[in-house]
Amino acid sequence: MSKLIKLTSITAVSSTLAASYYFYFVDRDGFHYQNSQWKKIGDKVQGIIDGSENINPSTPSNSNQVIVVKRPMTETMKDLWNEQIRNTANWFYSWGK
């Protein structure tokens, strides 16, 4: 009985793989494969390696600059402490309402 179950499961998996291969690569002249992102990237990389594809260098845009201000850690801790004190006071006074 167990050999029959193993044979059936192997046959089912093989049939599923064969059907998916057929529909992905063969059916409609490989439409899904030809339009897949993976193939497009592979073709572009192969073109760069062969030298037939031009590499356009990207220039960083200056319009998206982010200004970072570094504050001392003591100021950050003071802000956190003050926020906790305010939250505690609000919680305490909310009991009387």
UniProtKB/Swiss-Prot annotation:
The residue ranges crossing the membrane are: 7-24
Q: What does this protein do?
A: Component of the MICOS complex, a large protein complex of the mitochondrial inner membrane that plays crucial roles in the maintenance of crista junctions, inner membrane architecture, and formation of contact sites to the outer membrane.
Where this protein primarily resides, as one coarse class? mitochondrion
| Repeat among keywords | no
Annotated membrane topology is: Single-pass membrane protein
The Swiss-Prot or TrEMBL record describes its family as follows: Belongs to the MICOS complex subunit Mic12 family.
The protein depicted here goes by the name MICOS complex subunit MIC12
Q: Where in the cell is it found?
A: Mitochondrion inner membrane
